[in-house]
């Protein structure tokens, strides 16, 4: 466990708004594009996790939104969710960059918008980055076709950057498609694996909450490590090279706030007071 004051170590505080998080993601994208264009070693297939608003709050309020920060209640389904995500990408993540929104990857690929980033003709190298939103287990087949170059060969170049925003595939692709689609699942496990550095999450801003009700903010900005900040965002309570587990996050937040784990987390209910300990 690492605990340190931001003032002493010049660690940038977490974003205070959703638009602020999207602007930070833009800065990370700039670093990645510059590194890739200069042939500096950097990940080429990456993920960005953008926070999304809760329907009952101001659209720029950065608040706890359930597991992995992606459990907002969207009455309009993935279509509504995509419209909000697209707005953040257009207004902040790609602000100032030469880019073109190409539409949905396929008419059946719900929520999978595609952007080409960068200019120049195909002979001059074409665009250097492709952004895709919301690939999921049910739509990963379309995403695999994109990676294979069926929608354009630029993505197959070794220095082409592919950025996935708010991905939804399970684990390392083992639940893609239908159970009988053995070939698709085998391909997905090879291409979508997040093990050994695959599809590194280069940006994340997520409000977290332990079962005891202690909140904090989890952040990652490539090439920096993962940092978990306390409720007020003035102290780093956990720092790791890899994305911390939910248990690590909860234990760090509870320890910093000097509270115990809620009943049902890793203690028996008979050992706690129902008045003081509530399962959330």
Feature map (PLM): residue ranges:
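Positively charged, amphipathic N-terminal segments that serve as targeting/anchoring signals
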Residues: 1-143, 149-158
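Ordered hydrophobic segments in well-structured contexts
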Residues: 45-49, 129-133, 161-164, 217-218, ...
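Ser/Thr/Gly-rich flexible loops in soluble cytosolic domains mediating phosphotransfer, phosphorylation
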Residues: 137-138, 147, 154-194
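C-terminal structured domains
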Residues: 248-280
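A conserved mid-domain beta-alpha-beta active-site/ligand-binding segment of alpha/beta enzyme cores
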Residues: 173-258
